[in-house]
A protein has these predicted regions:
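Substrate-recognition element of Asp-dependent hydrolases with the DxDx(T/V) motif
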Residues: 47-71, 80-81, 117
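Non-catalytic pre-domain segments flanking phosphatase-related domains
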Residues: 1-18
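Mg2+-dependent phosphoryl-transfer enzymes with acidic/Ser/Thr/Gly-rich catalytic loops
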Residues: 33-40, 74, 79-80, 87-162
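Short coil/turn segments at beta-strand junctions that form active-site/ligand-binding loops
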Residues: 10-12, 55, 102-103
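A positional/architectural concept
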Residues: 22-52
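Short, basic/glycine-rich phosphate-binding loops at helix/coil junctions
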Residues: 23-30, 67-75
Length: 162
């Protein structure tokens, strides 16, 4: 990861997909149609480390799901969900923050993240990312989605910037 240190030190905005990054990309549905997903609590502690080094973060999800909003609220993370064009949201938020794309990190796991992964300075995927997007990544995390990959990323940014 030594070659990533300069990129990690430059991160001024971190953007995360939700399903497959904060979750293991599975969903449980009960007989009433209510959905449940599994999270890693360590990911929330990782976001606190981004707070410590003043790196803002955002969750962007294509799913218009109350579970996404509820988890984002608990994590005190800004969240935009129900989005068809993630890249447009990324462009808007980077412009609002005055952050160049080369100083943005994006963590995503699937083909609907490809445009964002291809646009930023530090494209990152979980260990279990869909094979089609792995070549777009500058960094393939060792942890899978929903099992500490957000924490792994946040810890590395924190270490590079503290």
């Amino acid at each position: 990861m030594t070659d990533l240190a300069p990129l990690l030190a430059r991160v001024r905005l971190a953007v995360f997909d939700f399903d497959g990054v904060f979750t293991d990309n599975r969903v449980w549905v009960n007989e009433h149609g209510e959905e449940s997903v599994r999270f890693s609590r360590s990911d929330g502690l990782g976001l606190r480390r981004l707070d410590e080094v003043d790196v803002p973060y955002l969750i962007v999800s294509t799913e218009p799901n109350p579970v996404v909003q509820a988890r984002a609220a608990k994590l005190r993370a800004e969240c935009v969900n129900g989005v068809d064009d993630k890249l447009a949201v990324l462009e808007e938020r980077a412009a609002e923050a005055g952050v160049a794309f080369e100083d943005v990190a994006y963590v995503g796991n699937d083909v609907n993240d490809a445009a964002c992964l291809g646009a930023v300075g530090l494209p990152v995927v979980p260990a279990d990312a869909w094979p089609e997007v792995v070549p777009l990544a500058r960094w393939v995390l060792t942890r899978p989605g929903g099992d500490g990959c957000v924490r792994e990323f946040c810890d590395a940014v924190w270490e590079a910037q503290r």
